[in-house]
């Protein structure tokens, strides 16, 4: 069990780290911050650059923390946030199956994050070496709630219409017009 938990945590953490660097720097065949920002704008996350930076940082930082087994519940929450946003903004409309562009892969990653927050990172981790023993069902539920809640707040803020307010006109207000008659 301990070996399997460590293997799962490290592999998933490294993969998230790689995805984050694709978004931020264009590494590993990614589109970099500008390409990611354009995609985010196209799905209604505006300003795209800020959302791309946040997603890339969450994946890079969360993936690194997860791979190291350091602050595991916080890492899980950040990665749950990214995956719940991906489900909400891209995959939910396609149903569950990945072959149809659905959310099954993202949901599986969320389940892994919840499981790691519940069980902890294992003995081969910085959390264990430093005596950080924050884990269990309540921690897992808090990581899930924080990830989904934080992502919802950010996506709602990013979905708001950001058009500038109309410029003032020289046309008098109705009350002013009535007073001059």
How would you describe each model-predicted region?
Residues 49, 62, 109-111:
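Short hydrophobic "helix-edge" motifs at membrane interfaces and signal-peptide entry regions
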Residues 57-66, 90-91:
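Hydrophobic, membrane-inserted alpha-helices
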Residues 1-27, 72-181:
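Extended, low-polarity transmembrane helix blocks
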Residues 46, 60, 132-135:
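Membrane-interface junctions
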């Amino acid at each position: 069990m301990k070996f399997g938990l460590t293997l799962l945590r490290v592999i998933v953490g490294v993969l998230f780290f790689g995805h984050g660097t694709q978004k931020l720097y264009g590494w590993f065949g990614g589109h970099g911050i500008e390409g990611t920002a354009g995609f985010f704008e196209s799905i209604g996350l505006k300003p795209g650059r800020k959302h791309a930076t946040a997603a890339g940082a969450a994946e890079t930082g969360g993936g690194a923390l997860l791979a190291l087994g350091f602050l595991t519940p916080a890492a899980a929450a950040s990665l749950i946030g990214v995956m719940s946003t991906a489900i909400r903004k891209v995959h939910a409309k396609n149903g569950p199956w990945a072959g149809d562009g659905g959310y099954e892969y993202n949901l599986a990653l969320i389940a892994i994050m919840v499981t790691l927050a519940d069980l902890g990172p294992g003995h081969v981790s910085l959390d264990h070496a430093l005596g950080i023993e924050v884990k269990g069902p309540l921690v897992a539920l808090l990581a899930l709630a924080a990830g989904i809640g934080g992502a919802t707040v950010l996506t709602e803020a990013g979905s708001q219409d950001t058009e500038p307010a109309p410029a003032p006109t020289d046309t008098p207000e109705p009350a002013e017009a009535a007073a001059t008659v």
